[in-house]
Amino acid sequence: MKKKQQILDYISDFSCTNASGCNYIALGVKPCGGPREYLVFPNSVNQSILQNLVTDYNEMDHQHNLQTGAVSDCMLVTPPNNIDCVNGVCTIID
C-alpha cells in the first residue's frame, strides 16, 4: 500500500542516538482484530504527524478488510520487547 510506504519514508527521515530514543506504534488491523505489526520509530519524529498517518492507514486497512472479506490467522501480535538504536535506526531486537 502506498500509504504504508509514505509512513516508512517519513520515519526514515529521522534518526536515533540510543535505545531510549526509540518507540513503537501499532500498524495495520488484522481482520479478526488487533494490529498486524508494530512499527518502531525514533522519538525525534513529529509524533502527531506520525499518529495521523498511522490512524489513516489503519482505517484504510480496516475498510479493505471489510470490503474484501479478508481473513487472517488471528494470532496475537505483541509489542516488541526489545528495541535498540542500530546505526541511527530504531530496530526490533529478537
Predicted ranges, named:
Residues I49-M75:
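Short cationic/low-complexity microdomains
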Residues Q6, G34, Q67-G69:
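Generic preference for well-ordered secondary structure
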Residues N65-D94:
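Short flanking/linker segments adjacent to small metal-binding domains or redox-active Cys/His motifs
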Residues M1-S20:
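Acidic/polar, low-complexity intrinsically disordered N-terminal segments immediately downstream
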Residues S20-E59:
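Mature extracytoplasmic domains of secretory-pathway proteins
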